[in-house]
Amino acid sequence: MAIDGKHYLSGDEYLHDAWRLAAAVMSSGWKPDILIALWRGGAPVGVALHEFFKVSGWDVRHIPLKCGSYTGIGENAGEVVFTHGDIVFGMLRKGDRVLVVDDVFDTGKTAKAVKARIDATGAEMRMACVYWKPGKNTTDLKPDFFVKDVGLEWIVFPHELEGLTPEEMRTKDPDLAQLVAECRRKVN
């Protein structure tokens, strides 16, 4: 559902789109050795892809990589920062096929930073994102796999709450808004 320039994804819609992404990767014939899910947004996508791969006959190693530059809705802090990146990138070897998974590819800044680190290992990287915003891309990169071009619309993922007003929370899910309001009253 789209309201005021924000697209509110349901959990089912997001999960089904992630499975479509997994099917697109498998249909390409390119099989990764390792799946790196970019924490936070890519984590649920990574879980869905890994499960889909596993039940379809692919056993792919997987690990999350915490990275980010966003400080809020539409607010980009600048430099991409990795937490424990040396550990994750240190696992990669020349010739490894690495599938990097994220929820959305917009500016391409995160993808570019990840690609630079993976390229330095000699591994081959491909990028899979559920959603793509080509109009926001500031790099020469694009995802190798994606499900939907979402234009410039801001996506509110099923798990996202921070930055939403009480009205937006009610729009997203009235039961959720009530739970949050009750907990806020108890805590404050």
Question: Where would I find each of the regions flagged by the language model?
Answer:
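PRPP-associated nucleotide enzymes
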Residues: 1-188
